[in-house]
Amino acid sequence: MDYKDTLLLPATDFPMRGDLPKNEPIRLKSWYEERKIYEKMKSKRAGAAKNFAIHDGPPYANGHLHIGHALNKILKDIITKTHYFFGENVRYVPGWDCHGLPIEQQVEVKLGDKKKELSKTQIRELCRAHAREFIDIQREEFKALGIIGDFENPYMTMKFEFEADIYRSLCEIAKKGLLIERSKPVYWSWAAKSALAEAEVEYEDKEDYSIYVAFELDSDALAKLGVKLAKAVIWTTTPWTLPANQAISLKPDEIYVLTSENLIFAKPLLESLVNLGLTKGEILKEFVSNELENTHAINPLNDRKSRFLLGDHVLMDGGTGLVHTAPGHGEDDYYICLRYGFKEILMPVDDGGLYDETLKAHSLLRADVVDSFVGMHIFKANEKIIELLGENLLHVSKFTHSYPFCWRTHKPVIYRATKQWFIAMDEPKLGGKTLREVARGELENVKFYPSVGIKRIGSMIENRPDWCISRQRDWGVPIAFFRRKDTKEPIFEPKILEHIAKIFEQKGADAWWDMSVEELLAPDSGFEAKNLEKVMDILDVWFDSGSTWHAVLNSKNYDAGSYPADMYLEGSDQHRGWFQSSLLVSTAINSHAPYKNILTHGFTVDENGQKMSKSKGNVVAPQDVAKSYGVEILRLWVGLSDYSSDLKISENILKQVSEQYRKIRNTIRFLLANVNDLETIGTDFGFLDQWILGRAKRVFDEASKCFRAYDFSKGFNLLLNFLSADLSGIYLDICKDRLYCDAKDSPRRRSAQSAMAIITKSLLPLIAPTLTYTVDEVMDYAPAIIKGDAKDAFDLVYEPINFDFDVEDELLFASREKFFELIDALKKDKKIKSTLELVLETTSSKILDYDSVERADIYMVSDVHRYSGNEGLGEFEIDGEKFKIVLSDASKCPRCWKFNAIIDGSTCERCSEVLNSVC
């Protein structure tokens, strides 16, 4: 007789292999086109007690997605779905950042010389078309990652009503008195011909000159010191700024010395300058810095007077203690000159980084050489400036240091004083508090994941300068203010500002270029158009994205959750970017942070921790992963990774993740296949079923806590360990006998099936936020006992296992582990082929009290007896209890293979009963 036909073998159509690259796009299409899953998610949780929404940090609408985009969007999706599968009402509206230099540069490259023939509006329309093209590309690439959101109505910063709301945010800040216009040194990209914000600057290594230059003191300064000759020695790494020198800064109340070479240095730095060879260190005179205040030295390049000032920015950690001060080229320089009442700020450099006619107009270089410098790029001028210094150049060398570069052009930037618009950090306009104070205070109400995030953004807020928000480009939201022609005073009349905002809503911000002052001016404004002119700068794109909370969460244009947002989630670089710009705009307008929680993730690196680059050949593209492995593997990689630090990804790592996925899939497949004939879930469980349900409850409860705390790596590793070690490695392996060989309705079989069904029903919504494609596929094949009323994955809600069994299992499983160690040796020595050949003997009354079949199944032997004096194959001791392995003297049952049959060739008692019942 072929007993195989009498066994209750597993049966399911759920495939062993997911064939993910082929099947995911089909399922994605059904989610968006047929089943309208995002709308379903909204309606399913319409009456939920809790709401949750991540406000999407907008990616830039340029280029294809890279692995960093995938990490960010998948993590947002996992968190949103975690809240959803825990029963909360969720919203996720994706967005795009559309304005800015990169798109404008792309358009300029395509246009070439034709750009000169086009109007500003025509260029802006080409920029708009470029952004629209890549939004469509990125939209499909994001959706393919399994992201569920309102992709039918995303926010875009270039939409007309959005531009109007960005402008309204600017107007609100202006009304608060926090918007100021002034000449001030700012980061300037000469390559892009525009000012830059701090967030638009990256640091790279750059080789520069290090020079020490002598400025001879004038007669008044010499008289003050009571000497006949003295030279102040300054140190600088920017020789090209020396023509614009206006002062020399000293540290207040510090001791300075005049050496035998008639050179002046700060005394604390004298030893290091001796080592450099600038001086022998012989001191002729000591004096306090304050004695030189408001006296002068002579700039050797132009014979202009350079005034001695006292400033706390002068440090004793390098240089000479005398700081070259050019207020047009440095922020500290600017502020100290402002404090000393300087009326004129010299700026001899144009927007392209070339010396301009200011050199001649203010005699900043000698008359015999100045013409050769006008039109010369400042970085090319360094060597020539050094030559002009002659004997006043005391020392020159080159060194490499970290230097600010433009994030888009990748060219070194400069500090350049220009007239710009700023949001003031230290004006007490917010109920007597400054923006800095309010922003810093609001951070205390925000929860950070990881918690160190508050220190990073807090220190940045503490130390940041005023925010320069103006740019001298075309593609952006205009700083659409009128100013009086006669006084140049900007006009912030609410009626005028709102009239412009309404025009932007209807026609877009292009109207600022297309329409005349008369057409843009509100009727009955009280002003005449002929007396007004337009401000033609545009806004920093960080202001665009920093005001998205206002345009998205505070408007009726989007169903995106409420203000403040439950969460902002971006890479750790956004502490100085979007998190900060959003905080400043929100606190400036509402004195409130725009978010309740901030979660940051690290960057993606290769398996060696190296940054990815095409030149290194270590780039992992999400599109390639989807084609080779499937998106689900990428999603599981995110779920398993510790996002609080940099995340490693490579071909080898993806193979490891694929193996983990295979284990999860096969475990679920086994569960489905073995509960297919279960109609009702029982409540009467045997010892082993109580044990696995107790283990599952504890693990699932802990994992769900981890997921709620966004610790996905810990939660998923708990689940994987449970699935592979406890569930598959022990329980399911043990249960195969009762599942396959018991009678269909035997209490032991139904008890095991019920435990498996309970675990499966809790497991699926727990892993669904990450493995959404897979869980949705499972629901296509799951039997009714698992599905219940659910039609697909999005009908599921996580429910904790409510069977809390506390089974005393330490001795049992410690002895089981030791038993299998001996079994491995017995099999290696070919003394046995299967554990079913064996009987285990023990002195433990506790183990012998268990049901006889259960205790035998736990060790996967044919029986467990009381310890005897019979000869064994091996023995061991656990906690004082003895265990002995002996060969069974019974016969092998040809149906279940247990050695429980009385006669060779006959079936055991259990199998005989089953066969009799079905015959």
Curated annotation (Swiss-Prot):
Residue positions of motif 'HIGH' region: 59-69
Positions contributing to ATP binding: K614
Pfam families tied to this protein: Anticodon_1, tRNA-synt_1
Family indicated by similarity: Belongs to the class-I aminoacyl-tRNA synthetase family. IleS type 1 subfamily.
Organism: Campylobacter curvus (strain 525.92)
Name recorded for this polypeptide: Isoleucine--tRNA ligase
Protein's job: Catalyzes the attachment of isoleucine to tRNA(Ile). As IleRS can inadvertently accommodate and process structurally similar amino acids such as valine, to avoid such errors it has two additional distinct tRNA(Ile)-dependent editing activities. One activity is designated as 'pretransfer' editing and involves the hydrolysis of activated Val-AMP. The other activity is designated 'posttransfer' editing and involves deacylation of mischarged Val-tRNA(Ile).
Binding-site list for L-isoleucyl-5'-AMP: E570
Keywords: Aminoacyl-tRNA synthetase, ATP-binding, Cytoplasm, Ligase, Metal-binding, Nucleotide-binding, Protein biosynthesis, Zinc
